[in-house]
Amino acid sequence: MARIPRCDFLRPPGIYYLITSLLAGLFLPPAIAFNLDVMGAIRKEGEPGSLFGFSVALHRQLQPRPQSWLLVGAPQALALPGQQANRTGGLFACPLSLEETDCYRVDIDRGANVQKESKENQWLGVSVRSQGAGGKIVTCAHRYESRQRVDQALETRDVIGRCFVLSQDLAIRDELDGGEWKFCEGRPQGHEQFGFCQQGTAATFSPDSHYLVFGAPGTYNWKGTARVELCAQGSPDLAHLDDGPYEAGGEKEQDPRLIPVPANSYLGLLFVTNIDSSDPDQLVYKTLDPADRLTGPAGDLTLNSYLGFSIDSGKGLMRSEELSFVAGAPRANHKGAVVILRKDSATRLIPEVVLSGERLTSGFGYSLAVTDLNNDGWADLIVGAPYFFERQEELGGAVYVYMNQGGHWADISPLRICGSPDSMFGISLAVLGDLNQDGFPDIAVGAPFDGDGKVFIYHGSSLGVVVKPSQVLEGEAVGIKSFGYSLSGGLDVDGNHYPDLLVGSLADTAALFRARPVLHVSQEIFIDPRAIDLEQPNCADGRLVCVDIKICFSYVAVPSSYSPSVALDYMLDGDTDRRLRGQVPRVTFLSRGLDDLRHQSSGTVWLKHQHDRVCGDTVFQLQENVKDKLRAIVVTLSYGLRTPPLGRQAPGQELPTVAPILNAHQPSTQRTEIHFLKQGCGQDKICQSNLQLERYQFCSRISDTEFQALPMDLDGRTALFALSGQPFIGLELTVTNLPSDPSRPQADGDDAHEAQLLVTLPASLRYSGVRALDSVEKPLCLSNDSASHVECELGNPMKRGAQVTFYLILSTSGITIETTELEVKLLLATISEQELDPVSVRAHVFIELPLSISGVATPQQLFFSGEVKGESAMRSERELGRKVKYEVTVSNQGQSLNTLGSANLNIMWPHEIANGKWLLYPMRVELEGGQGPGKRGICSPRPNILQLDVDSRDRRRRELGQPEPQEPPEKVEPSTSWWPVSSAEKRNMTLDCPRTAKCVVFSCPLYSFDRAAVLHVWGRLWNSTFLEEYMAVKSLEVIVRANITVKSSIKNLLLRDASTVIPVMVYLDPMAVVVEGVPWWVILLGVLAGLLVLALLVLLLWKLGFFKRAKHPEATVPQYHAVKIPREDRQQFKEEKTGTIQRSNWGNSQWEGSDAHPILAADWHPELGPDGHPVPATA
């Protein structure tokens, strides 16, 4: 099928035409091959290299005998004898025959006068047109050269061009009948005037056949012009015609300023010569000097517009029944333009409208056609722009359709139809006439470089041109390349009252496509009975229901005299809609053809002539136990015209007539519905059900009959599904058929016939089965082969007031790590009257990693003691402090972690306190597992950054593979009486990251982690830090943290309980002696300094007389004597004592001898005698 690209509409003002064109394409059915006969195309071939087919024209002569001709121009045909040239071109006439090489050259240009002319490469046949049946023909040679002063120094050559007008029998008679036309001959020479006129590049006749119109695009420095000449000389109505001729620049004035084409930028003064002379007359081509140039607003800005490159005419363009002329200027203003001209009384063509192209170098105006597409009495304009292109949309070539709005062209927005890239779509246009006899003219558009070439046929209509082509002729089908370079239509050459189409090419071949007569068929279908009552069997056996069908056909055609006998093959298809849904038809035809299926019946009717009505009949019966009682049985009638087989046609045989064809714009199918008598649907016999999905939610399957709803997201509408090894998931569904308004129960809620639930599953879920809590409610569910679509039968019918709850079991095997959401689409369906909308149930999918992490420290209590020692003095780990070992265990109960991403086991190690002093010094980090069989992990960064010597016993144990020895647990003494700070002032502290300690993170990658991994970390307390900073602390808690991190591209990965905390308590060793690390000489100096201060103090006191004893008289000095109380009297003394000894009594007591001492009691007071005085002691 040919690709038919289409452009958008250009500008918004023409909204009426935009809408009407769309409606025309919408309501008229498509037709890829309509009534141009491709199989019976007539080919004609010319001389190789002659460009046979460059121009074509259909012609029909009436005198002296009727004959149809295919006129083909070959502008590179070899010269005739006597033409004094190699290639001159020519016009060929081909009869309507099956012979491909029976064309002959029309004798119109013999001989040559080389002193006045040159016919070498004159391109005779560059254009050819016919007036129609019994009319004249014009053909031109636009490169015909007129010469003067041949072989002299002042020789001139002017490419003026010329045309020939032939009689209807292809003969040239006197000038009154036709003859040779050279209007540029004898005019001013040079390419700025008429020296390169190129008359005949385009030529045509006016539709009333009174005028001959020429285009001369080389006039006035290729600005171009158009000329209208009277061609009806000698006719009886000559007196009623204007004399003419008429010319765009004025036939008498010859003023290029009167030519209205837009300007372009071909500027400057140009001299082209091959003569070394200062004589300006010897310049072959020149532009005017600035002083001699024409004055006016345009000047020579209007050069090179090529006005007259295409030409046409028509009535009703500007005013009703007034003839106007249209000329194309494809290079005007670099975009192209089209000018509508009218003739005035002064032999001039006056411009009335100038239509400009929209794109640079599009060639707008390269081709033209004038016709009334919508039959409104106003001629419309079709313009080709074959060089148009849209790079992004891949479009090439365009045709603009201007629909005439009562002679007003200012606000018309044209319809633009585009072709394929580089197709030259629009290089040729032709008005075909009424090709299908629908009352509207049609057009053809050539695209010679779309593949081997194509011709697009567009029909007219009351709404304008139909933008979708009714037929596409392809050069490949007839074996012609560059097919469609030239076109000619609008004339019936085979006598069947339908216009035909002649297509030329650049491949020296042309082809005629004859139009096939169009038949308009009428058909009727009669059904008995019109409604099916399943309770009333009427078949012959008395058990089943039968239906009689009668079909009748007739046809009409244009013209009414065309009345062939035709055969129509028809086919009846029963229960079409059900069959198209993939269901078994409910009908069986009792009479059917050998090749018919059970639900089909075919036949043939013969229509002998127009209006002949012929009928056929058949019977079908319904199947037993019909379930679908609400949907009508659709019977589809399709028919087609039986085409006689094409026999092999040999040259010399008489040209066969073309077979008729059915109207492609008339549907050839008809549908008829046969309804059932409806029961149980209320008094109005209309079943208005009210099926509703009351509940639909995802569930986890606990057991075969027990389900639990999944938790919901925050929105309350989306479930959360954790992908953790669940092979199945449930979908709970509850469907009801209850009245929507209990106060009006008859309004709806009727029985739902063929009630179904249609389930569409995503690619990640597959249907597995159905469960119901009540086996009676369990529906029948069937799925397709891929288990992605499920149909559940809810009942036929599902009764009023019914409710059913069931669970769909869905397999989760298709859920992958990339699955983030589950969406199941649900749609209730019934053939009862109810509008039902689809419903979606969704669930977010997340992958929960079943990882667990735990840790333990050995020992869990540590003590610090010893002496303060600097970092630089440390040599071995044993000098640091007590050893501690941390063991972190990670377990994985799910799939291997490397399928989900990369994981790391991290331990946050508090190695320093806030001021930067060492806290817990890491010695060694080892990872077992998580790396594959027999591999140990490498963690970073490396511990033991001070490179301290490792305990030799530990190294030896690791080399022998022996386990760590279990150290006895250390006990904390409860007594803290020796602590230098009182118990009330002691406090507890916690050293943790990142508040009170600085941490280093040891990260260990876990590769191929599928079971368990253990991380061992050995460290030692830094005694010096604790002795210096935490002597006043009652207890210290050192926290080590560990966690797991996973890096993955999976967005829905969830990791829970992936961290742990390992505390260790630290105390000051109560049995340790704190020895200050002070040098001995400092102590010695301190002792000496103390002695010196003491000596100075004694000397000072001595000088002050502190050590001199005061001397008093004996009478004034009290004497104290110690009295010894016998032991046996002491108890009596204590019993008689009535009070405490007063301080005044310690002054009257005297010591009894120099060697006597008072007795000290247990509380270090003197022991008293019976008299209350201290008891002296004896030696």
From Swiss-Prot:
Membrane-related topology note: Single-pass type I membrane protein
Extracellular side, ranges: 34-1076
Annotated compartments: Membrane
Disordered, as annotated region: 952-978, 1134-1153
Sequence ranges of the FG-GAP repeats: 38-103, 110-175, 185-238, 292-349, 350-411, 412-467, 471-530
Stretch forming the signal peptide: 1-33
Disulfide bonds, paired cysteine numbers: 94-103, 140-163, 184-197, 539-546, 552-615, 681-687, 781-792, 939-993, 999-1004
Description of post-translational modifications: ADP-ribosylated on at least two sites of the extracellular domain in skeletal myotubes (in vitro).
Compositional bias per record (Basic and acidic residues), positions renumbered to this chain: 952-961
Subunit structure: Heterodimer of an alpha and a beta subunit. The alpha subunit is composed of a heavy and a light chain linked by a disulfide bond. Alpha-7 associates with beta-1. Interacts with COMP. Interacts (via C-terminus intracellular tail region) with CIB1; the interaction is stabilized/increased in a calcium- and magnesium-dependent manner.
Protein name per the record: Integrin alpha-7
Binding-site list for Ca(2+) 1: 372, 374, 376, 380
Segments for region (3 X 4 AA repeats of D-X-H-P): 1155-1174
Glycan attachment points: 86, 784, 988, 1023, 1043
